[in-house]
């Protein structure tokens, strides 16, 4: 006999979610000009105990690439299994100054088996403009040795390493937030309603029209005369203003892992669906003048023994039929 589920508003959930959470502007946005920049370079890891590159893949092309990036090696240097060609990557933060240290990551380019115990030789790191902004060097840390993983995952993680504070900044990163007498606030998650709320909150805080949302991702902010010579203090006050971001009605499902994530006010229209051993009847109730929600539906399905794959398949059918008010994203 099929199981019948009635998802009504009379269902009382032991856990409730409130989406009217306020947060600081600095947690959802940043100032234009104050962003990370990506650096990259090609280097050589030495000191590997026979787990480096075989030498068969170290073609003249790779040698030329290393010379282009300022690393001088001979073909014989690359034939030993104690060395490995690596790509070196780093994110340099805004306002980084000469002499500061930043973290970097190394990843094998060729057929090395493991970078564990290796040492990265001095490697220049370039920006998108072709200039050297940092130099990396140091011991490679693999980590995760005690974590139980499949053999395939273990092999993958052993050829990617980490150098905490392994690169020294050699050139200041130019960062200019001020454009005339204004700065621009950029939302990390563009949204029309959130942009309008940020502008309104700033204007209410300073009791003057300083901010204006110019599109869903940007708010133009005029620096008042009182702070023309103290921009940092003004921006710090702006960062601490609390706003209520607008959370879109959205469901995200990962078919491979069976994960279901839903946020915002995702609601359901009335429907009846039959799926396998389940018959689901969803009815919007009258209590509190609210509709049936995804939270109610997923909780009821889990209580009835539905697997994550069952839940995902049911959500897909409901969404494609137009009974979900929100966006469904399948990963």
From Swiss-Prot:
It comes from the Bacteria. The keyword Signal applies. One of its GO terms (cellular component) is bacterial-type flagellum basal body, distal rod, P ring. The keyword Signal applies. InterPro entries: Flag_FlgI. Its main location: periplasm. Pfam families: FlgI (PF02119). Transmembrane segments: none annotated. The basal body constitutes a major portion of the flagellar organelle and consists of four rings (L,P,S, and M) mounted on a central rod. Belongs to the FlgI family. Assembles around the rod to form the L-ring and probably protects the motor/basal body from shearing forces during rotation. This is Flagellar P-ring protein. It comes from Thermotoga petrophila (strain ATCC BAA-488 / DSM 13995 / JCM 10881 / RKU-1). The lineage of its organism: Bacteria, Thermotogati, Thermotogota, Thermotogae, Thermotogales. The gene is flgI.
């Amino acid at each position: 006999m099929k199981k019948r589920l009635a998802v009504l508003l009379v269902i009382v959930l032991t856990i409730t979610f409130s989406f009217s959470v306020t947060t600081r502007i600095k947690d959802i946005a940043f100032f234009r000009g104050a962003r990370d920049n990506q650096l990259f370079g090609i280097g050589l890891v030495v000191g590997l105990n026979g787990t480096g590159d075989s030498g068969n893949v170290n073609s003249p092309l790779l040698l030329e690439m290393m010379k282009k990036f300022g690393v001088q090696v001979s073909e014989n240097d690359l034939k030993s299994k104690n060395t490995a060609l690596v790509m070196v990557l780093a994110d340099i933060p805004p306002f980084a100054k000469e002499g500061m240290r930043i973290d970097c990551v190394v990843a094998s380019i060729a057929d090395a088996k493991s970078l564990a115990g290796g040492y990265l030789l001095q490697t220049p790191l370039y920006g998108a403009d072709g200039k050297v902004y940092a130099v990396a060097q140091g011991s490679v840390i693999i980590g995760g040795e005690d974590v139980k993983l499949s053999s395939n995952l273990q092999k993958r993680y052993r050829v990617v390493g980490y150098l905490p504070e392994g690169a020294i900044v050699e050139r200041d990163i130019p960062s200019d937030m001020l454009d005339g007498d204004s700065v621009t606030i950029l939302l990390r998650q563009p949204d029309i309603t959130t942009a309008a709320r940020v502008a309104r909150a700033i204007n209410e805080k300073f009791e003057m029209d300083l901010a204006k949302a110019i599109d869903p991702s940007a708010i133009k902010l005029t620096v008042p005369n009182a702070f023309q010579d103290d921009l940092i203090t003004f921006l710090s006050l702006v960062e601490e203003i609390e706003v209520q971001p607008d959370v879109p009605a959205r469901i995200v499902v990962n078919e491979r892992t069976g994960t279901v994530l839903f946020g915002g006010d995702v609601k359901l229209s009335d429907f009846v669906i039959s799926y396998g051993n389940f018959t689901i009847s969803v009815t919007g109730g009258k209590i509190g003048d609210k509709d049936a929600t995804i939270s109610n539906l997923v909780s009821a399905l889990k209580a009835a023994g539905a697997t994550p794959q069952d839940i995902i398949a049911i959500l897909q059918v409901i969404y494609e039929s137009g009974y979900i008010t929100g966006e469904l994203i399948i990963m």
